[in-house]
Amino acid sequence: STLLKAMLGTVSPVSGSVRRMQGLAVGLVPQVETIDWNFPVTVAECVGMARARGVRMPWITKRERAEIGSVLDRLGMAELGRRHIRELSGGQQQRVFLARALFTNAQVIFLDEPTSGLDVRTRHDVLHLLDDLNADGLTIVLTTHDLNGIAAHLPTVVCLNRSVIGAGRPDEVLVPDVLERTYGSPMEVLEHGGMRVVVDAPLGDNVLPLRRSGGASA
């Protein structure tokens, strides 16, 4: 979260610097846990608020309403424009803030833990949506701790722990040495269905047998 804030210019880096291209339009999709979903706005109003900053009369114009409808339709939410944001599912909540970012004509979108708290199916839906947006030319930068559900499916992965530990394709970065230096504990990488799966490495005598009900050990 702090890294994204530094890249967006909302906090100053303690060291180093951030260079931003002049005229580059960026958008942020925050963690869903940081949003007050009881705030009294509809989906369309929430999206329209993205352009309200610095506007004396922040009312949605007829043209903007049409643009909002187009953005929501692109994300498969055309029928939800008048629904209150608290009535949305986790995946729909993520799409609302993606719509906000797209409504500002962002060229780069930053997402903070976009799959946090989502079930497996919804997580895959969000991932496929991001992949489609990226294929359409949108640059996407996201943070995640979900190595198996998200990181292994990304085209480029960067592991950070006070500095860059590794950067490259998932098969280059998701390796035991890089992961151990990133997380500070032993990790193992397995192959399953052509994909890399990261698991905690056993710690010798600290590993206890899993007991099933009835007293049998696994």
Where are these regions (language model features)?
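Conserved ABC ATPase signature
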Residues: 84-88, 92
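ABC ATPase nucleotide-binding domains
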Residues: 175-176, 181-218
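Catalytic Walker B motif of ABC-type/P-loop ATPase nucleotide-binding domains
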Residues: 109-112
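Helix N-cap at the start of a conserved alpha-helix in ABC-type nucleotide-binding domains
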Residues: 120-122
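Helix-to-loop junction immediately C-terminal to a conserved catalytic motif
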Residues: 8
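Conserved ABC ATPase "signature" region
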Residues: 48, 62-80
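H-loop/switch region of ABC-family ATPase nucleotide-binding domains
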Residues: 144-145
